[in-house]
Amino acid sequence: KLKKYQMIGKKVSAVIAVDFAGQPCQWEELSKLSEKYDFKLINDNCHAIGASYKNDLGYGVKFADIVTHSYHPVKNITTGEGGAILTNDKKIFDKVKLLRSHNIDRESNKTKNQGAWHYDVTQLGYNYRLNDLQCALGISQLKRLERFVKSRNNIADIYRDHFKDCDKYILPNQNNYSDHAYHLFPIRINFLETKIQRTSLFEKMKELGINLQVHYIPIYKHHYIKDK
């Protein structure tokens, strides 16, 4: 599709690739495509904090222009809520730094000439700052990240062993080029083949004290996007 867009004169500005469930994408290949077709590469790394790609824990900013983290309570580490953006691009860093705090500019030459007290807002920004308590919690969690990920992998091994003889279930793929962070362990089921209804399965599992979830309903199926 990138080649097709190029042929008709359309430019792709950015591509977002998701390390879904904790499994890193093929980032080296994606990086080569971004160079070839001149687009920004964004790594949605929210599920894969603690994963490694080709034995590199810091693979995110090595291959992508922007890496996004989520520190929601169910993620591999948490600050209670919130997240972060990682980048090695100074221009992107400066832009994000402004956007996170109402786009208040205290550092430009124009502002400095007005006096040390002066600041300016040139466009709409946001209130996306983590507070000190959230940061302290995040730092304490970060120190235990390796243990958290190891525990998730141990649990995943138990699931794999339990379902190893169930050919009607498709388990998460473990690529040989990466180490999985197992934010999720999605099991895919062919409901037509198994002759099981999804709602019946969910209700039965709930009776057993196990809450299942669908991860995720595709964005294009939500009315907000449909109405666009």
Question: How would you label these PLM feature ranges?
Answer:
Residues 1-79, 84-91:
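Active-site phosphate-binding strand-loop segment of PLP-dependent enzymes
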